[in-house]
Amino acid sequence: MGIPAAAENLTLARILVVDDDVAVQSTVRLLLERAGHSVVTAGDGRKGLSLCGTGDFDLLFLDIFMPGMDGFETMRMVRQQHPLMPIIVISGRPISAEPGTAPDFLTMATKLGAVSSLQKPFRPADLLAAVTGCLEAAKRASPSSQPSDGVASCR
């Protein structure tokens, strides 16, 4: 599995993955590292928030539903420290509601600053496309070409 052609021109990113499912952490880490990115994982929102405060990350993958501090609360707190960091939400529950049903977690996450979403189980190509899209959008939005300097929609 090589680096996608679209990613070859990007500065490889430092990515934080926050998910309580160790299998998901491992899968995402493997896919992203094979694509050349540096990956740090955390098993809950509090640990992720702590790492976010000490690391310089270009992108955050964040599970919505975790015990303790859920993804929504984690996202609120990350936004206070890093208002421009691109966040991709991931969840095993349906993210978007069918018309006429509630709740719509994607709308909630978008209001808190998520720029993209993936529903588990996701295809490796979808994960890599979401990362590439977010990093390219952030690069275009940043005059200094640093992915973490600007956030643009990367859906």
Please place each PLM-identified region on the residue numbering.
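Active-site residues of response regulator receiver
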Residues: 63, 91
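Alpha4 helix (beta4-alpha4-beta5 surface) of REC/receiver domains from two-component response regulators
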Residues: 73, 94-116, 129
